[in-house]
Design a protein with these regions (language model features):
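Alpha-helical transmembrane segments and their immediate juxtamembrane cytosolic regions
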Residues: 2-391
Length: 391
């Protein structure tokens, strides 16, 4: 990635007019299904935070599986969505300019977030997760609004709230006359140096932010220690639009260095598990602080993030750059699923409460039920309502 030039480029203009990248749509709905999987795991695993939990006593093997799987997902799936969002934000700004760009982001990100905070979230908490007090829904809802509790109740829509902030900041930067440098795919050596530097910056910035922040801290319903990764991936997406990375990064490069990153992450996570305290139930160092465990985990997350991103790009671009009726339907409903899945998933979890299955098996079943129910709710309710324009 050795070719750098400043200013508006022909590549960016071409990206704005390029045919739709169907493999990106397929990555997007795949990541949404992983969101459902994560929240299903939050329901049954010893880790995570969710509206409704149905935890049972788990053995070490089950706890280790959940810890590894959830940490693995957390390391890359939302970051991938931020990268995609940054990529298309750059192209959207090129087409629209500042005011229409920001107005469109408010409509497509702000309105659904407010809908969740004011309607879907309160209904879910009162009628399904039972996390609100007594006194009737209307009473609790007005109390929720009056006391300002709704401002911190973004739920899973924290992603859209954060993305709205990122988009506005990006728009202001572009309005000031600055633009991303064009970093086009070059020789493998130059590209590998850029990637190595990106991994190091991501790991170091995440580690530094997590040093002094409490494990339970939250901004927009997400831990501040995760923001460095999200900001960097959004910025990388905008740079990727300038350099046409989605189509231009060579497949062999993506596979080679994606594999190197993931293979390198395996001994690192093994050391973190064996010697970081997790097997003894001492997990506090994994979340932050000035210690080698937190530093190692931040590096592991960065390796997984970049490695999975490169491999997904190569695999989806080669094998899934097309859509039939089913994949088109899944793609059309992906955002609606993200918006509506909490009450659907929690309702399914309540129905499964008496099922005497292993926690892993129940999480798999809950994922499947939530996916079917959420896609159906999006297709036959949300997309047949006035909300169709924004979901």
């Amino acid at each position: 990635m050795a070719d750098l030039s400043l200013g508006m480029t022909a590549a960016a203009a071409n990206a704005s007019r390029a045919p739709r990248l169907l493999f990106i749509d397929n990555i997007r709905w795949s990541m949404i299904i992983l969101v459902l999987s994560m929240h299903a795991c939050d329901t049954y695993s010893p880790f995570g935070n969710w509206y409704y939990v149905d935890r049972q006593k788990t053995d070490l093997g089950t706890a280790l599986f959940f810890g590894l799987y959830q940490s693995f997902l957390q390391a890359f799936f939302m970051a991938a969505l931020f990268f995609i969002a940054g990529y298309f934000a750059a192209a959207a700004y090129d087409r629209k300019g500042f005011a229409p760009f920001v107005r469109d982001r408010f409509l497509r990100l702000g309105v659904p977030t407010l809908l969740f905070m004011l309607v879907i979230g309160p209904l879910t908490q009162y009628f399904l997760s039972w996390t609100w007090g007594s006194g009737g829904f209307a009473h609790q809802w007005f109390k929720h609004i009056r006391d300002g509790e709704w401002l911190s109740e973004t739920g899973p829509m924290w992603f859209c709230a954060a993305l709205l902030v990122f988009s506005i900041v990006y728009g202001l930067i572009r309005r000031s006359g600055r633009s991303e440098p064009r970093i086009s795919p070059g020789d493998d050596r130059a590209s590998s140096l850029w990637l190595a530097g990106f991994v190091i910056v991501m790991a170091a910035s995440t580690f530094l932010v997590r040093i002094g922040i409490d494990e339970g801290a939250s901004v927009l319903n997400v831990h501040p220690g995760d923001f460095p990764q999200y900001v960097l991936m959004f910025a990388a997406g905008a740079l990727g639009c300038r350099g046409n990375w989605m189509s231009g990064l060579p497949e062999r490069f993506c596979i080679r260095f994606g594999t190197i990153a993931l293979v390198g992450s395996v001994p690192l996570i093994a050391v973190l598990i064996l010697f970081g305290g997790g097997l003894q139930g001492e997990t506090q160092h994994y979340s932050g602080g000035f210690n080698w465990v937190s530093a190692g985990k931040c590096l592991w997350e960065a390796l997984v993030c970049v490695g999975m991103g490169l491999l997904m790009l190569a695999v989806y671009r080669r094998h899934f750059d097309r859509q039939g009726p089913v994949s088109k339907w899944l793609s059309d409903n992906a955002f609606g699923v993200y918006l509506i899945h909490p009450p659907v998933l929690i309702g399914a979890a309540i129905l499964l409460h008496t099922l005497a299955w292993n926690a892993i098996a129940k999480a798999l079943l809950l994922t499947a039920l939530a996916a079917v129910g959420s896609f159906a709710a999006s297709a036959f309710v949300l997309r047949k309502s006035p909300l169709r324009a924004i979901v």
